[in-house]
């Protein structure tokens, strides 16, 4: 006995092809759906038929004219006997695919010798039945082995995860700062403690956060390093303050950027101007005023950006001129004010900016800081410029820093929210609205530029 495989878009089509090669009395060994029919592709069915090696080429015992003339595509297989019916069930073939109907010349069929009574047909059916049983048994055994293998793989992965956690705990037993003076850190927290400390966070702030985590974290969560990191991440998120971008303008917004030299105030202002005027769903009217008349090339740099974006730019020297330009830009939704960079130790020049801020206008003051600055210097800068009434913090050069712990410490200490982050040199793309999720990811997983990831 030989087995042949045929395929078609439907089971009936595959059976027709098989019958065209081997006759209408072909015995079906197996029917299988290979691919379901979808909107974009046709279905695919596979049928396996069993044929005697010396195929009987004679005319079939029952002429085709004896079949019901109204047979549909699904009524394609003759019901030979109860034995064949049992074989059909073992093969898992739908009864609709194997049902033969007889409506004409029934007496003639009864007079003819039954096919199953002949030795040839009986042997064929016995062999096919045994083959079907063997196939069913093999399938069950194969399924059992696959289920067992999947369970073994899951068990191995779980054991490997426990081994990795155990190795981390063993390694952390020998860490240098196992017992800080202020907080007794358990070994299972050593990995996250070292990550946070290497980021540049102030020790007292880190100890405070660790103490908070130890007090609030359930004991059952401490057995897994992934769970510990996830919990610590949530604690940091709650500590960091970020101000959402407010575009519901009831009146024009005046934003002034202040800060020390070299932190990127002018470039950040150009990014903000492009964002408000071009990159948002609504295109806002933007005007620029610069107080930076001392730095060589500062006005030219800003004028170049303003000309590219087709917006007005004015340079002023004193508070009187400043007031005039504010009135002249009354039509704008946003007025962005660039200032001269001053050292945090030049108290006199910093105080000189107050006369512009105290002119009766509602000015939103943002202190621009570079994350490449160490925490102690950041704190000095914030204290010096704090006399101007800082509303938000803008951090630049995130792409040039290896850690953001100093940023976390300053925000935690000052309780001032972060509004924007500069994540690269490209104008206007590399400006991001600050979110605590992004900052925590950068701190614990390393910096990533969201614009380049999307590209």
UniProtKB/Swiss-Prot annotation:
Gene Ontology molecular function terms on file: ATP hydrolysis activity; GTP binding; GTPase activity; signal recognition particle binding
GO biological process, one term: protein transport
GO cellular component: plasma membrane
Compartments, record wording: Cell membrane
Binding-site list for GTP: 259-266, 338-342, 396-399
Keywords, sorted A to Z: Bacterial flagellum biogenesis, Bacterial flagellum protein export, Cell membrane, GTP-binding, Membrane, Nucleotide-binding, Protein transport, Transport
Primary role: Necessary for flagellar biosynthesis. May be involved in translocation of the flagellum.
Topology within the bilayer: Peripheral membrane protein
UniProt KW Repressor keyword: no
Protein name, UniProt field: Flagellar biosynthesis protein FlhF
Top-rank lineage group of the source organism: Bacteria
Secretion signal span: none
Homology family: Belongs to the GTP-binding SRP family.
Major localization class: membrane
Gene for this chain: flhF
């Amino acid at each position: 006995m030989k087995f042949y495989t045929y395929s078609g878009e439907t089971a009936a089509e595959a059976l027709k092809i098989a019958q065209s090669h081997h006759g209408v009395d072909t015995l079906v060994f197996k029917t299988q759906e290979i691919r379901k029919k979808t909107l974009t592709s046709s279905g695919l069915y596979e049928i396996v038929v069993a044929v005697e090696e010396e195929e009987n080429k004679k005319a079939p015992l029952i002429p085709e004219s004896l079949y019901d003339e109204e047979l549909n595509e699904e009524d394609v297989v003759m019901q030979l006997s109860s034995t064949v019916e049992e074989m059909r069930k073992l093969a898992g073939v739908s009864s609709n695919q194997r049902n033969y109907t007889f409506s004409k010349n029934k007496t003639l069929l009864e007079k003819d010798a039954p096919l199953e009574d002949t030795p040839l047909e009986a042997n064929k059916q016995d062999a096919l039945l045994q083959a079907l049983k063997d196939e069913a048994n093999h399938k069950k055994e194969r399924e059992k082995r696959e289920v067992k293998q999947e369970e073994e793989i899951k068990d191995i992965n779980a054991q490997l995860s426990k081994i990795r956690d155990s190795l981390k705990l063993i390694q952390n037993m020998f860490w240098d700062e196992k017992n800080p003076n202020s907080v007794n850190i358990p070994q299972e927290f050593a990995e996250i403690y070292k990550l946070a400390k290497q980021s540049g966070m102030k020790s007292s702030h880190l100890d405070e956060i660790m103490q908070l985590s130890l007090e609030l974290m359930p004991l059952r969560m401490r057995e897994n390093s992934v769970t510990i990191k996830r919990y610590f991440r949530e604690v940091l998120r709650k500590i960091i303050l970020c101000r959402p971008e407010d575009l519901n303008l009831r009146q024009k917004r005046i934003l002034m950027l202040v800060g020390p030299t070299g932190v990127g105030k002018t470039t950040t202002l150009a990014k903000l101007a492009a964002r408000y005027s071009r990159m948002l769903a609504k295109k806002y009217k933007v005007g620029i005023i610069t107080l930076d008349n001392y730095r060589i090339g500062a006005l030219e740099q800003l004028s170049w950006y303003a000309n590219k974006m087709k917006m007005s730019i004015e340079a002023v020297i004193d508070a009187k001129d400043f007031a005039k330009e504010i009135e002249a830009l009354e039509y704008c939704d946003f007025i962005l004010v660039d200032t001269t960079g001053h050292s945090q130790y030049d108290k006199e020049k910093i105080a000189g900016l107050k006369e512009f801020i105290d002119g009766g206008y509602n000015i939103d003051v943002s202190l621009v800081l570079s994350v490449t600055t160490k925490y102690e210097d950041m704190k000095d800068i914030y204290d010096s410029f704090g006399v101007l009434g800082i509303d938000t913090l803008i951090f630049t050069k995130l792409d040039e820093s290896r850690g953001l712990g100093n940023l976390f410490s300053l925000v935690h200490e000052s309780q001032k929210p972060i509004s924007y982050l500069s994540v690269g040199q490209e104008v206007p793309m590399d400006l991001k609205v600050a979110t605590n999720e992004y900052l925590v990811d950068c701190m614990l997983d390393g910096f990533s530029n969201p614009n380049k990831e999307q590209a």
